[in-house]
């Protein structure tokens, strides 16, 4: 795949090299070249965001651009690539663009509080779209990615279609509850009772190699999207959520608040819905209409 809008590999946090995200060995590269486009993501690329923070992204497929943003504690690979969602979407003729949010994945993980102003993730999203020169595109995200999508829409983003996954109405309009939940998790690591939601979230944090200090900073970026702004979203919007997921409020209520919203329930809860094929299929079918 051709690199878009000058996106190149570059150094980043912790001694990132230009080879980060590339596979090693000629035999492996030959194998990748023989795979269908829809199963072979590009190497990780980087750009400097509005404040100079290096932000990583990957792409999969060719065609109409769709930007998909992952959830908190996660990254593009875990949320979109590992369980085949990006491949399903790319197979429908889409160029799936998947950033790692700041403090996540291969993006920079600054510890300076100044790196986490209100709506920083929103500004990163706008910066990525500008960097890639996108003018006709679709936009969506899972959980924190869906919240970031709502903030981008409230601050001028103009996608054709919108996806809110793992998200309910209260998760957009009342962010303080979730911020408090995650602040408790990150401030009491190693102390949560086994089997509780807090313990499960900490276990997920460990699997993704999350940086607790940087992730605490992310909580300072949260901003509510007023209900009036939600109701002003005029694009066709898919609200796709696990049938057992109420972590971010009611998904049916969110769909009802959107002028052109539709709700699709998939199997699972907030954590488990991501591993189910129905999530990617619902998004692919919606975008391909």
Region annotations inferred by a language model:
Residues 241-269:
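Conserved loop-alpha-helix segment in the C-terminal half of the alpha/beta-hydrolase fold
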Residues 88-91, 98-137:
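Active-site loop/oxyanion-hole signature of alpha/beta-hydrolase fold enzymes
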